[in-house]
Amino acid sequence: MPAISLDHLRHHAVARTLFPPTTLPQAIARLGFVQADPIRAPARAQDLTLRHRVRDYRAGDLEHHYPALAIEEDFLVNYGFLSPDVQALMHPRQPRTVWSAERWRQAESVLEFVRARGEVHPRDVAEAFDHGRVTTGFGSASRASTALLDGMHYRGLLRVARREAGTRLYAARPATPPPADPEAAFDALVDLVVAKYAPLPGVTLGQLLSHLVHGVPQWRHLRAATLQRARARLPSAEVDGLRWFWPEGEEPSSHDHQPREAVALLAPFDPVVWDRTRFERFWG
């Protein structure tokens, strides 16, 4: 393999991540994970990401087509959209915050209610159960039932069936058996994340593993060993004083990765520019 330069890495990053527009399912599959954000101005993160990668994409298309797509909403390194197979690797999730027996009784009652209805709006749960109100992390008051639904979704008891004007509607989620090999499952999740953000500096690889632990808190004790394995098994090269990593089978120095003769306005959540360390190395 020829010596790899920063120009090689930059061209490779743009070519592999900002690929020619395709269909919505194919774009999601190629990205592996699409980060979501509720802020609508100038548009949601998922729409700003997909508009460059899906033919004739319009704001809201992902939300509109979500029920018919083989995707789920869940937390990986951040919240977003991913395949059911990837979601299954992370469950049953064991959050660091342990619920009390009373909280579990509330969850079981709500789960029974959801199963009977098939699909529920948070408003339906609030009207059926008197859970009171809680203070959010932003200091505002919110229905306790909304926080409970969020917690049930995070724990894998519920799934997002669809959205209505941006609000998540929930359905019961079948229980997922734990992976037979947690280390292999963790490695597979690392590979997915690396495939989205590669080529990436070693410091970013470590940061992504820390974010990934929020998606699989039950494996937080495996983080150090998983990072060590990733550094050992992923292709890498030292460039301008940093160790860079990318997926197996890729060649950043390939002549296929020529500069694009086009201008793209990218949002901060876009995988091309998401990592500040890489962005500063590539573009100053």
Say what each PLM segment does:
Residues 273-284:
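Short, basic/aromatic recognition patches
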Residues 1-263, 270:
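Long, low-complexity intrinsically disordered regions
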